[in-house]
Amino acid sequence: QEWSLPGTRVPPPADPEGGDANLRCVCVKTISGVSPKHISSLEVIGAGPHCPSPQLIATLKKGHKICLDPQNLLYKKIIKKLLKSQLLTA
């Protein structure tokens, strides 16, 4: 299955030497079981000094933002694909 969503983006990793004072996990609570058909865009924040695991933030079609469980098998595939595509375009 193809998981390219129109609003998908992978921001660059946080630069610890850049003085980013907001170095912490964005996703404290995650949800699994959200169907991709309800998602309008995705944002992947890779693991780094700010957070030990990747974070997957979904914007639902109704406008709500939620954090998806990065350990969910389906979401792991999405994260892997998005991070791979970022490396290819960098």
Curated annotation (Swiss-Prot):
Function comment: Chemokine released during platelet aggregation that plays a role in different biological processes including hematopoiesis, cell proliferation, differentiation, and activation. Acts via different functional receptors including CCR1, CXCR3A or CXCR3B. Upon interaction with CXCR3A receptor, induces activated T-lymphocytes migration mediated via downstream Ras/extracellular signal-regulated kinase (ERK) signaling. Neutralizes the anticoagulant effect of heparin by binding more strongly to heparin than to the chondroitin-4-sulfate chains of the carrier molecule.
Post-translational modifications: O-linked glycan consists of Gal-GalNAc disaccharide which is modified with sialic acid residues (microheterogeneity).
One GO term of the biological process aspect: antimicrobial humoral immune response mediated by antimicrobial peptide
Protein name: Platelet factor 4
Keywords: Chemotaxis, Cytokine, Disulfide bond, Glycoprotein, Heparin-binding, Phosphoprotein, Pyrrolidone carboxylic acid, Secreted
Highest taxon, organism lineage: Eukaryota
Lineage: Eukaryota, Metazoa, Chordata, Craniata, Vertebrata
Residues found modified as Phosphoserine: 41
Gene: PF4
